[in-house]
Design a protein with these regions (language model features):
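Sensor-1/coupling segment of RecA-like P-loop NTPase cores
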Residues: 139-165
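Interdomain motor-coupling "hinge/lid" segment immediately C-terminal to the ATP-binding subdomain
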Residues: 159-291
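Hydrophobic anchor at the beta1->P-loop junction of P-loop NTPases
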Residues: 56
Length: 308
């Protein structure tokens, strides 16, 4: 891409540059999130260490783009210069465009001080994005000390590429972040009119290794008054899942709509079965067969015949 094209996109999408006080209401990602019947933030980027290089991975439609914009909101609240934050969705780009992006944005950003680079959909670049980021961290002294957040949808591709970034992650102590769909605990709080009292639930989920018989008995005893509600919420959660789009549709209408079904099928086709090169029809049939066979023995050859 040409520098002028990149700069035009930056000024049209980084709304906080021109409107640092009221950009949130103008931003399409945050505006869509505010239309949801609940407020939810995964908080996976709340503790960025300046100078770190972070990779945030997770399935499509889980809210990574919104999380990036909320990071912008938090940085501005902390007093960061709006022009020191550059956000770009690089869907459809090639690796060389990343270098052009850094050079073009550099001319529009403050000449001194730390900067924040929030690069969305990095895994859409299929010709070596990690090697290009590595080169920039090695050869651009200022970019090397900047805070960089890269997001991607395909965890397998990200895992394959993250090795190239070894030694270039800066002071980040936890550089690899994962954003997953909403868990059952949060789902209950969002959809239930009378969720369990705070004192009835542990402040944080327990690790599997910590689920001793005594702790399980204690938790079951404390949650017994809400057993009927939790059982109903669990059935809903198994049906709805934790993608924010699905949870919002459930809260609004309690029934899924066709557009939601298609959106979530795109998540599955684009992430889970991306390397299988299955058609949408084959993907749908595979999901149907897997759902029918839950709890019974699995025959891979039989499944292959059904989707062939």
């Amino acid at each position: 891409m040409r520098a002028g094209q990149i700069q035009a996109r930056l000024t049209s999408t980084n709304l906080w540059w021109a409107h640092p006080k009221d950009w949130v209401g103008r931003d399409p990602d945050l505006r869509e999130a505010s239309d949801a019947p609940f407020v939810h933030s995964a908080g996976v980027l709340d503790d960025l260490t300046p100078g770190g290089l972070y990779v945030l991975r997770g399935p499509r439609r889980v809210g990574k783009s919104v999380e990036l914009k909320r990071t912008v909101e938090r940085l501005l609240a902390e007093g960061v210069d709006p022009r020191a934050i550059a956000h770009m969705s690089v869907d459809g780009w090639v690796a060389d465009d990343l270098g052009a992006f850094v050079r073009a944005a550099d001319r529009l950003m403050p000449p001194e001080g730390r900067r924040w680079w929030l690069i969305d959909e990095i895994t859409s670049i299929t010709d070596g994005w990690s090697a290009r980021i590595k080169w920039l961290r090695d050869n651009d002294s200022r970019f090397r000390s900047d805070t960089v957040v890269l997001t991607g949808s395909s965890s397998s591709n990200l895992r394959d590429s993250v090795g190239d970034l070894a030694g270039r992650r800066g002071p980040a102590s936890d550089p690899d972040r994962v954003m997953l769909p909403i868990g059952f605990r949060t789902f209950v709080k969002l959809v239930s009119r009378h969720p369990p009292a705070e004192e009835a639930t542990p402040p944080e989920p327990l690790a599997v290794a910590d689920l001793t018989p005594d702790r399980l008995r204690d938790a079951a005893y404390r949650l017994t008054p809400w057993l009927h509600m939790l059982a109903e919420a669990w059935e809903d959660y198994l049906h709805v899942g934790g993608f924010p789009l699905a949870v919002a549709a459930h809260i609004r209408a309690r029934v899924p709509d066709q557009s939601l079904r298609l959106a979530l099928q795109g998540v599955i086709s684009g992430d889970a079965f991306q390397r299988a090169r299955l058609s949408d029809l084959q993907t749908g049939e595979m999901l149907h067969q897997l759902a029918r066979g839950l709890g019974s023995k699995f025959n891979a050859a039989g499944l292959a015949r059904c989707i062939d």
